[in-house]
Amino acid sequence: MGEGNIVTQVLLPLSLAFIMFALGLALVVADFKRVVTAPRAFLVGAFGQMAMFPVAGFVLASLWPMDPALKVGVMILASCPTGATSNLLTHFAKGDTALAISLTAVVSIASVFTLPFVVGASVVHFMDAGTRPDISVAQTMIGVFLVTNVPVALGMAVRRWAPETALGMERVARHVAAVLFVFIVLGAVYSVREDIRDYFAQVGLAMLTLNVAVMALAWLLGRASGLARPQRIAVIIECGLQNGTLAIFVALTLLGSTAMMVPGGIYSLVMFATAGLFLALVLKTRAGV
């Protein structure tokens, strides 16, 4: 197995699995019960992540001039759930952290079923028959399940049966997961360093546009739905931050495409810049948002 294969087939899946395990350590069954106890806020957030974001991604990919593989990469990103760091940012922004955790947990599990179909349809729609990578919806579903749902379930099991151990592990695991995320994103960008100028020219502004547009639409959605300010903050952050590590995993490990990985890598850089600006805004402006 070559060095590149070791990274994409071993290190990347294991890193993503650890990140999802760290997420599971913070979850309890009550996080899933909020789907019933606070349905309106949850449904608004879930709609924003699972419907609004993919539609916005499809519109942008259809209209923005870029290579077909990059268009598919946009759709891979758009069909991923939010990243675990969204919960921490929601907490810092004085948002509804419980809602953010519930959205992250449920949408992450649901994406196992939705992501493969969106990606499969996007490959067929945007790419010519001769350039399409081999993709199996079932195999993609299994691959995503093994590196997301299984580690989350293991983390929750530790939290359930050994809560003190889980709390101690969570503090360390959260920091390790953050470091792994940074290395994965920077490593993904570095791997295309020879073509990075061309890729940034094609999708850099597009990813910024997508990120700002989705956060603005999430704000409008929260306002129109009559959500309280903390809930609106949670929905905006949950919709704006995506699981870039999962997008990179699907593109590189499951589809074997470096180009399809680029939108997820660039978006991961952009989203923390805009999230930081949003955090500064909500902390400065106690009313509104």
Model features per residue range: what roles?
Residues 1-289:
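Alpha-helical transmembrane segments of multi-pass small-molecule/ion transporters
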